[in-house]
Design a protein with these regions (language model features):
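Intrinsically disordered, low-complexity acidic regions enriched in Pro/Ser/Thr
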Residues: 1-192
Length: 192
């Protein structure tokens, strides 16, 4: 497996890793993903005094070179993070048990009073926080990727790339340039 590459199965979830309800309106399940190896990518944007922020998170099947993106709606964020991963690994504490800590401190919550409540999936969630709280602001594990989300909480644009009725790419956009936003509004008919 190449660096920053993950293996996805046919069932994938696009969600803020804090959400324990996989069937909630705030995330998106994709049940027709082309199984295989996916390259992961984040695009960063220099946001002045805010520093470098992640503008988008993308997974793309390794055989696809020129995706055509289709807007399929949006996904919600409440913890300032977004994950794209196999349904089998989402909030799976058994998967998290073997994941290394990536920050120097290890568990970012320690005994802190705001530590997430002890519930199923908390071990996985804390390991995802470990990936987004480091300088890179994102990270992968065998069957998923997680990143911080631009300026944090909100609703973000979700796009897929399809071929032969199978999804072979997912992109979540957190930040857009002013020009991209104007082009989008023009396409939606907000300008004459």
């Amino acid at each position: 497996m190449k660096e920053n590459q993950i293996k996805l199965g046919e069932k994938v979830i696009v969600s803020d890793p804090c959400y324990s309800d996989v069937d909630g309106w705030f995330n998106n399940q994709i049940n027709n993903m082309r199984p295989g190896m996916y390259d992961t990518q984040v695009v960063k944007s220099d946001e002045g005094d805010w520093g470098d922020r992640i503008a988008s998170l993308t997974v793309l099947h390794e055989i696809i070179k020129s995706p055509i993106w289709e807007d399929i709606g949006s996904v919600a964020v409440d913890s300032g993070q977004m994950s794209i991963c196999c349904m089998t690994s989402y909030r799976n504490d058994e998967v998290a048990k073997d994941l290394p800590w990536l920050t120097e401190k290890g568990d970012p919550f320690g005994d802190h009073p705001i530590r997430p409540t002890k519930e199923t999936g908390e071990g996985w969630y804390v390991k995802m926080c470990d990936r987004t709280l480091r300088e890179e602001q994102w990270g992968t594990y065998e069957s998923g990727v997680v990143s911080s989300t631009g300026y944090g909480d909100g609703m973000y644009k979700l796009e897929v790339s399809k071929m032969d009725d199978m999804v072979h790419g997912i992109r979540v956009t957190f930040l857009q340039s002013e020009e991209e936003r104007e082009d989008e509004l023009l396409e939606e008919g907000y300008y004459d």
